[in-house]
Amino acid sequence: MKVNPSVKPMCDKCRVIRRHRRVMVICVDPRHKQRQG
């Protein structure tokens, strides 16, 4: 899980979602998981 000021999809499978007022990227590749913070 990377915590970045700006989250961007890294591949075609990445999905940008909002959970509990947080912007997150979920993907089949665990290295692509990101959270804004």
UniProtKB/Swiss-Prot annotation:
<dbReference type="Pfam" id="PF00444">
    <property type="entry name" value="Ribosomal_L36"/>
</dbReference>
<dbReference type="GO" id="GO:1990904">
    <property type="term" value="C:ribonucleoprotein complex"/>
</dbReference>
<dbReference type="GO" id="GO:0005840">
    <property type="term" value="C:ribosome"/>
</dbReference>
<dbReference type="GO" id="GO:0006412">
    <property type="term" value="P:translation"/>
</dbReference>
<dbReference type="InterPro" id="IPR000473">
    <property type="entry name" value="Ribosomal_bL36"/>
</dbReference>
<dbReference type="GO" id="GO:0005737">
    <property type="term" value="C:cytoplasm"/>
</dbReference>
<comment type="similarity">
    <text>Belongs to the bacterial ribosomal protein bL36 family.</text>
</comment>
<dbReference type="InterPro" id="IPR035977">
    <property type="entry name" value="Ribosomal_bL36_sp"/>
</dbReference>
<keyword id="KW-0687">Ribonucleoprotein</keyword>
<dbReference type="GO" id="GO:0003735">
    <property type="term" value="F:structural constituent of ribosome"/>
</dbReference>
<keyword id="KW-0689">Ribosomal protein</keyword>
<protein>
    <recommendedName>
        <fullName>Large ribosomal subunit protein bL36</fullName>
    </recommendedName>
</protein>
